[in-house]
Amino acid sequence: MITIDEQKCTLCGECVPVCVRRILQKGKTSVEIIDPAMCLYCGHCKAVCPADAFQFSEGNDQFLSVPNKKQIPSPAVFFRFLRRRRSLRFYQDRLVEKTKLKMLIEAGRYAPTGSNRQACEYVVVSGRKALDKVCTLAIRNLQEQGKELQKLIDEYSRKKKPLPEEWASRQTLPPVWERIAGKWEEGVDQLFHHAPALIIIHMNKGIATTPEIDAAIASTQMVLLAETLGLGTCYIGFLIWAIENSGELKKKLGISPENKALVAFTVGYPKVEFLRFVARNPAKVGWVGEFEG
């Protein structure tokens, strides 16, 4: 619910043009809300109001002052910071504090979402005992998927038929999953890399308008904040495949049947200090308009 304190409103009109749904207009004594039900709750109006006349029934206390320009890092510094983040697969045998894990969740919570649905939900698995149980279930499922996939690959090969696109991209994975399973039996964790914590983002796709994008943005903010906390992270795409293929694993993680796991990443203190940035391929860019050609 959004309301306007008429005593505070100065009719400056700053809020009217920034309203995404165009439901604000100047009245005689204050700005008026034409159709409250259409409000997106994006907070633009409250964020620009010099008099702080807008009130939200939820989250009103979260509209804090933004940092001044001097507190924002320069483009060069920020770009180098972005490049600093890399996949970490070597972790110290050290528990990540709950306070830091909660900070990562907060970073995800404040990420933008399609139509402001804010549908992201999180599972935090902490400690090797709990992680080992999840890892065992995940590897077992991946191994089963690998065997089924290999049967299909062999069948299509015998018939000399091309694999369907969805399988073709995974045809190299069965031996990878077998190797991961074999190493796990030897006590080597090649799925979670012996990390002390794991975070999974999931959501009800019936609520979210852009679920995959929302989860990706939230996780990006989280892994970047992790860098400032002295933590490293690594995305674990194989786990998502396992969760969505195993009702047992989904239940173990407390993810509702109607929700879909979208992103998973490990978290922990680095065991190795990297001295150089990671290399990337050149960007493929098509310019349209002013800079075309």
Regions found by a protein language model. Give the residues of each.
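Acidic, surface-exposed loops and disordered segments
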Residues: 1-293
